[in-house]
């Protein structure tokens, strides 16, 4: 099994601390064979909203140029993939699809951080009330689009909750795993979250209960470092996460396919024409 990671952020998202090239060098030094750089995507909002946790639209071109430059510069030492981490914002998904085609994005990972759009400031980590259902519904709807290589931190809803799982959340975890199985969308074992669990002394995400549920389905799992600083690419963390994930009866994969966004667009057009 190759040591790979497709969940990498840089200082461009305004809440991570590693520069692009620093992250690449850290990955090489720590034995990674493939590094996917997948910073939080920009969005073309209908409003004048400015997000605090992602690059702005006018910052994307520099991000793209940098990743492609590093991909070529370090091609003899590591394979670099050009990705983004994106939510499922229904009213902006057509724009995102066209954006991925135009910019030849290799893949998206699905980070379900906000409900509907972050313009509304409804954060889904530790969601309460009606947004518990909203979290799981949007996970499922997003996974069904075929636009995402995998679902990142599927247990994000447990953030800042102490890891308490209600019957409603347990049912939602089953829905995620059933959709993962039916639509062949892998699930991420999030290594940044594992670090948080270790510091706190209890589980939020990743959570044992979730992966016990996942083992009841025919799902695929992938490690995601969710690197926000160069220390997050430590090989020891990767190995520890692999050891933990290997305890569950799930298939562990080390690669994700490039997503054919042109094909997805063509299939949508066929549906519209019917």
Language model: regions and residue ranges:
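Residues at the C-termini of beta-strands that transition into short coil/loop
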Residues: 84, 111-112, 256
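Charged catalytic cores and adjacent phosphate/nucleic-acid-binding surfaces used
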Residues: 1-10, 20, 25, 158-274
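Short, contiguous clusters of charged residues that form electrostatic/catalytic patches at enzyme active sites
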Residues: 62-65, 133, 137, 209
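Serine/threonine-rich low-complexity intrinsically disordered regions
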Residues: 46, 93, 117, 128, ...
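Divalent metal-binding pocket/active-site signature
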Residues: 17, 42-45, 106-199, 204
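Structural preference for beta-strand elements that scaffold enzyme active sites
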Residues: 2-5, 34-36, 79-83, 106-109, ...
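An N-terminally biased module of ancient metal coordination in phosphate/nucleic-acid-related enzymes
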Residues: 1-86, 90, 94-95, 100, ...
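Acidic (Asp/Glu)-rich catalytic clusters
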Residues: 3, 28-29, 66-77, 96-106, ...
């Amino acid at each position: 099994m190759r040591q790979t990671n497709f969940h990498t952020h840089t200082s461009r998202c305004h809440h991570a601390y590693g520069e692009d090239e620093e992250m690449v060098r850290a990955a090489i030094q720590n034995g990674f064979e493939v590094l996917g750089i997948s910073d939080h995507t920009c969005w073309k909002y209908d409003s004048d909203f400015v997000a605090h946790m992602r690059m702005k639209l006018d910052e994307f071109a520099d991000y793209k140029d940098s990743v492609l430059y590093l991909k070529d510069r370090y091609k003899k030492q590591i394979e670099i993939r050009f990705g983004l981490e994106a939510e499922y914002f229904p009213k902006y998904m057509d724009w995102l699809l066209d954006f991925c085609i135009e910019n030849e994005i290799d893949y998206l990972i699905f980070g379900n951080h906000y409900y509907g759009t972050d313009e509304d400031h409804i954060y889904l980590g530790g969601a309460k009330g009606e947004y518990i259902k909203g979290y799981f519904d949007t996970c499922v709807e997003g996974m069904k689009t075929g636009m995402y290589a995998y679902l990142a931190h599927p247990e994000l809803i447990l953030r800042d909750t102490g890891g308490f799982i209600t019957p409603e959340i347990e049912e939602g975890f089953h829905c995620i795993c059933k959709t993962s199985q039916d639509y062949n969308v892998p699930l991420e074992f999030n290594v940044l979250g594992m670090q948080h669990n270790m510091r706190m002394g209890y589980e939020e995400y990743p959570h044992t209960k979730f992966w016990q549920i996942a083992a009841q389905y025919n799902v695929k799992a992938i490690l995601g470092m969710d690197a926000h600083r160069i220390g997050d690419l430590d090989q020891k963390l990767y190995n520890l996460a692999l050891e933990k994930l290997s305890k569950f009866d799930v298939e562990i994969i080390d690669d994700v396919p490039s997503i054919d966004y042109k094909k997805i667009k063509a299939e949508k057009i066929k549906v519209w024409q019917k």
